Amino acid sequence: EAMRDKDKQQVFIRKVLIDACAAINRFKDVNRVAFVIDSHSWRYRFYQNYKYSLTKVKSPYYKDFNNLIEKVEKFLRNKGFIVSRVMGAEGDDLLYIWSIYFSQVLEEDLVIVTGDSDIRQIINPKVSLFCNNSKNLKFFCIPNREVEWNEYFPTDIMVNAVRPFEILLYKVIMGDTSDNIP
């Protein structure tokens, strides 16, 4: 019901924007901000049960949720933010493309702010990940940059060094239960 109530929709949109601002404000030297928005994944064509445990739960309000996301997207675009949304691509797909663009084309550092830590395999020497979806704020980077990031952040953010290849290898061997991949 909350997804259909106009007042609660406004509260939701405000919360999304305030949370985004709070996360961005943790970084002293932000040059650009880009947002990525999920689209219905191409993966469903190959595996019908992809994300089944998630989609069966959200299906009653999925259309209402998408309408809210479209309002957030429109607001962000009107304010001049970079917004990436590609039909058939999930947010993770777009984040991977952005990580390549920033690290290999522009040769700039990129911090991805997300609530989804299961994309840690895209981390590289120029790409790090800030997870702001819990009380325990987590930052993921390659081992060579752990000290640098620990000095950058206040102590309320836990900096974790990860080896992206090991994460990728684990997913290939064990599957990804969060996406219902055996």
Show the residue positions of the predicted features.
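Domain-level signal for Mg2+-assisted phosphodiester chemistry and nucleotide/NA-binding surfaces
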Residues: 1-79
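Extended two-metal-dependent nuclease catalytic cores across DNA- and RNA-processing enzymes
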Residues: 30, 56-182
